[in-house]
Each structure stands twice: as C-alpha cells, then as structure tokens.
C-alpha cells in the first residue's frame, strides 16, 4: 500500500490529466480522480487478470468495480491500475460477506485456472509469494516442506513459532476432501464495500484455485479472529460442503501467513489461536 501519487505519465495514459486526485487511504492505497480510482498493483499478472475478469463478469446482488483501460488498451501501466469508483466501506456484516462469496463463486465457476496460479513462489519473495506459499502449506501433505527445502525464512518470533506448531498439529486432523477446486476470491473479509441498503460492492478479485467453501471458511476465520464476529458465525454456515475440513485448511492458511509474513504482528496471533481452537471442536 502506497500513498505516493500516481505519476503524471500514468494519469495521462489513463486520460486523467485534468482531474485533482483525492487520496483514498483504505482503497488499497488508491487515488480517486472523479469517477475513476488509480491503485498500485502488487502483482502485474494478477492485476491484469482481475481487470479482464471484472470487465465482463456479472454477479447477482454485487456491484463490481469495472476496469478503466489506458488509451492504448492496457489494464496496468507502470504498476498502476484504474477502476470505476464504488461508494461504500467495509462493515462487520460478516454473514452478508459469506453470502456475497457464494454468489460471486457461482459466477466464477466456469473461469479457467490462470497459469500464474500453478507457479510456485520464487525467492526472493514479494508479498504475493507469501500468500501462495501459505496457501500451499494448508493443502500439501507435509505443510511447509517445500518452503524449508527452498530455504525460506520461517518466523523465529514466539508467536510465529507457535503458529508453526499449530499448523503441524492441525495438519494431522486433515482428511481428504471431494469438493472440486475452482476460481475463488480468497480475501473477501474487509474488502466488500457496504453503503446502507445498497448492493454490496467489490473492487478486486484475489484469485485462488480452491473449493468454494474454503473461501467462505477464510472469511469466517478472519471475522472470528480479527473482526469481532460472534461465535455463532461458525455454525451458521455448517451446511456448506465439508465445512469442518474447509475451516481447518482456512485457519492453517492464515496461521501460515502469520508465520511467513514480514509484517505480521504479535497482536494478531491470540485471535487466530482462539479460532484454531474453535475449528478443532468442529472436527
């Protein structure tokens, strides 16, 4: 996330030379130019994929930010993307966010798997590699084996070490799942925008190739760990396929992010550990 204004040539390429920018701190470090938002992108391939997908995707009961192409047709220019501005802000309406995820994933069910989702994380890591590695850790037979083999730096902080211990314990509780993977948005907590009674909005799609109930599980794990959700949230979605096993992999994923991410804070761990205990009780 950056607060640096988009450079003049980027603004010009998106046709935004005449408009005064307004900083939108919480919109992924974006800048608003009238009806258009310029945001810095963390990963070019993912940003271009998200833009292309959002250009035509239609989802019942969801407003999607549409990409604004540069004058030469590009989605990403010098590390910036442009989208239509959506009114709204994240709110702790956790059940509604899970509902949004189910509607979104009906619409993404027929999308092909992008090539970049099959690529392993590469050293030296950037932000996106941390999430790829953490995602793999939750599903591979021996969590984090590939990372250790690749010489990745695993956390040495007390909470980081505790995260790694928990991942090892939780891994033994996994059973094979049958729900097929598809294209899902793996980071919906805190990214769905609400504006009163208006239709919820979404500005980006963070792609993973996993089962739909796993993506719902990540929302629930995040909401319980950091969003002040009531404990009943866990049970209200128990009808989703293979729910306990999906929650298990979702909490392993978040624990792995905690252990691997350089900006993890000790304060984030207690909520996550408590959620891991709750998930254990569902198995």
Regions found by a protein language model. Give the residues of each.
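Active-site acidic catalytic loop and adjacent metal/ATP-binding pocket
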Residues: 26-39, 67, 168-212
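ATP-binding pocket architecture of kinase catalytic cores
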Residues: 21, 26-115
């Amino acid at each position: 996330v950056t607060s640096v204004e988009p450079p003049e040539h980027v603004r010009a390429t998106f046709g935004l030379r005449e408009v005064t920018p307004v900083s939108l701190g919480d919109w992924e470090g974006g800048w608003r130019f009238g009806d258009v938002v310029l945001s810095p992108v963390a990963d070019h391939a993912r940003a271009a994929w998200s833009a292309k997908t959002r250009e035509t995707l239609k989802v019942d009961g969801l407003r999607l930010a549409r990409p604004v192409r540069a004058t030469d047709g590009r989605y990403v220019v010098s590390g910036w993307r442009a989208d239509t501005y959506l009114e709204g802000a994240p709110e702790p309406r956790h059940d509604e966010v899970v509902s949004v995820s189910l509607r979104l994933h009906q619409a993404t069910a027929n999308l092909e798997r992008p090539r970049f989702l099959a690529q392993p994380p590469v050293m030296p890591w950037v932000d996106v590699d941390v999430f790829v590695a953490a995602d793999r850790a939750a599903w591979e037979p021996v969590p984090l084996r590939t990372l250790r083999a690749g010489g990745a730096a695993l956390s040495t902080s007390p909470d980081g070490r505790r995260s790694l211990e928990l991942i090892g314990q939780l891994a033994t509780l996994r059973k094979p799942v049958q729900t097929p993977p598809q294209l899902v948005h793996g980071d919906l907590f805190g990214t769905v925008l609400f504006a009163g009674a208006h239709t919820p909005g979404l500005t980006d799609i963070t792609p993973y190739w996993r089962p739909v109930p796993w993506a719902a599980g990540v929302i629930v794990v995040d909401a319980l760990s950091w969003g002040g959700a009531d404990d009943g949230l866990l049970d209200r979605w128990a009808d989703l396929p293979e729910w306990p096993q999906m929650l298990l992999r979702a909490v392993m994923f978040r624990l792995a992010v905690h252990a691997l991410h350089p900006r993890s804070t000790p304060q984030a761990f207690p909520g996550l550990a408590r959620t891991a205990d709750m998930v254990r009780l569902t198995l």
